[in-house]
Amino acid sequence: MKFLFLTLVLLYFTAILVFIVFPSYAQIQTNASCTTSTHCVEPCRKRCLLIHKCINDKCTCYPRINICEKKNN
């Protein structure tokens, strides 16, 4: 019974971490407008970031993937 309780608590905190903390941490919104994610390739590339999503008609980049660092290595 104790093991089941600890497992449920661990799953609960994992769900919070994955669905609440990570998405808000991972996105940088640019000033570029978009209708699809394809329109965000160039604005995100200018900031040395790969495309992430088109959210609310604004390009949103993913800051952990840095194109410039990968090209320099």
From Swiss-Prot:
Q: Where in the cell is it found?
A: Secreted
Give the top-rank taxon of the lineage listed in the UniProt record for this protein: Eukaryota
Description of post-translational modifications:
Contains 4 disulfide bonds.
**Pfam families on file:** Toxin_2 (PF00451)
Q: Which InterPro entries match?
A: Scorpion_toxin-like_sf (IPR036574), Scorpion_toxinS_K_inh (IPR001947)
Provide one Gene Ontology cellular component.
Answer: extracellular region
Q: Which GO terms describe its molecular function?
A: ion channel inhibitor activity
Tell me the first and last residues of the signal peptide.
1-26
Q: Which UniProt keywords apply?
A: Disulfide bond, Secreted, Signal
Q: In which tissues is it expressed?
A: Expressed by the venom gland.
Q: What is its main location?
A: secreted
- Domain statement: Has the structural arrangement of an alpha-helix connected to antiparallel beta-sheets by disulfide bonds (CS-alpha/beta).
Q: Family, per the entry?
A: Belongs to the short scorpion toxin superfamily. Potassium channel inhibitor family. Alpha-KTx 27 subfamily.
User: What is the name attached to this protein's record?
Assistant: Potassium channel toxin alpha-KTx 27.4
Species of origin reads Mesobuthus gibbosus (Mediterranean checkered scorpion)
